[in-house]
A protein has these predicted regions:
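Generic helix N-cap/helix-start motif at coil->alpha-helix transitions
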Residues: 2-8, 82-91, 117-125, 151-155
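Hydrophobic/aromatic side-chain positions at a characteristic register within alpha-helices
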Residues: 4, 9-19, 33, 97, ...
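Residue-level signature for tetratricopeptide repeat
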Residues: 14-15, 31, 48, 95, ...
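Helix-turn-helix repeat elements of alpha-solenoid scaffolds
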Residues: 17-24, 54, 68-69, 81-84, ...
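Short, charge-rich amphipathic alpha-helical segments embedded
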Residues: 21-57, 149-156
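Alpha-solenoid helical repeat scaffolds
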Residues: 29, 110, 143-147
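Alpha-helical linker/edge segments of TPR/alpha-solenoid repeat scaffolds
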Residues: 47-75
Length: 156
């Protein structure tokens, strides 16, 4: 039974890293029935409880830029939330959330990359670069920040 739980938890983490927070949450809720005493799963449940309403409300925000900004600002709140939890933070779970949240932000910013206004494009390139930096893709981040500075010197 424990091996099955661990396998499903790995699947949940992989889906989470791709940014499908709702599907990952569904898998975790199924696991919770059999793993109430598992501290990693409890920590993940607490993390999902922070994000789930935010993710569900994203479709009500019309502008992709505002969606991206919401995700980035909530990430900062999330880190404060994690510090206050009774569970010891699990770095792997935090990494999976970081990948998922910043991937979602990237998806939203990329919808605006072809903005005709140079200033807007510079800002979008900067935001995309910052997301890639958080995801550990430093070369891509650097390229985006260089593009941002090319479009509007001093932005990035």
């Amino acid at each position: 039974m424990q091996a099955q739980i661990e396998e499903r938890f790995k699947e949940c983490c992989q889906i989470l890293k791709k940014g499908d927070i709702l599907q990952a949450n569904d898998i975790l809720n199924q696991l919770l029935i059999d793993a109430l005493d598992n501290e990693r799963i409890q920590f993940a449940v607490n993390c999902f409880s922070f994000w789930i309403n935010i993710i569900r409300q994203l479709p009500t925000i019309e502008e992709p830029y505002a969606k991206g900004e919401t995700l980035l600002s909530e990430w900062i709140s999330f880190l404060s939330y994690v510090e206050k939890q009774k569970y010891t933070p699990d770095e792997h779970i935090l990494y999976c959330f970081k990948c998922g949240i910043f991937s979602l932000a990237l998806d939203n910013y990329y919808q605006l990359i072809n903005a005709t206004d140079f200033e807007q494009r510079a800002e979008i390139s900067r935001k995309i670069g910052l997301c890639y930096k958080k995801l550990g893709e430093y070369e891509t981040a650097r390229d985006c920040l260089i593009e941002s500075n090319r479009l509007k010197p001093g932005v990035a």
